[in-house]
């Protein structure tokens, strides 16, 4: 009985170690319609400029201030200002001095955001663009699980064999 459990555990170990590599190969070999798809920004015949449609540029909207083709696909929106921010660095544990902050209360981890400073509506004579002024904010995050998912299966099988 122990021998059969050991064989099953060994087979699970082999499958767990090979599964991520096999999955990544399959993802790179996707063919068919997916290769023929294009984003609207990449296709000249489908792309339309705001002037052609008649869209008025809104300088208060952070997404209309710049060319949409240049905007990163991975945006993070700051819940306080509503502006599009860029992620800076990795998810890190909150220091004890910041444990009471809203972004640290949820998970105990934080990630730095580089956000544009919102324009003060009372200051009409502001000479700089709001996107030129940046400020650092934080958002709650959870640390990335760096362990491979197959390792948990192997650990489970080994515990079953040993018990």
UniProtKB/Swiss-Prot annotation:
Keyword Secreted: yes
Assigned GO CC terms: extracellular region; host cell plasma membrane; membrane
Keywords: Host cell membrane, Host membrane, Membrane, Secreted, Signal, Virulence
Protein location: Secreted; Host cell membrane
Short sequence motif named RxLR-dEER, residue ranges: 37-52
Keyword Signal: yes
Family classification: Belongs to the RxLR effector family.
Free-text note regarding domains: The RxLR-dEER motif acts to carry the protein into the host cell cytoplasm through binding to cell surface phosphatidylinositol-3-phosphate.
The protein, known as: RxLR effector protein PITG_13625
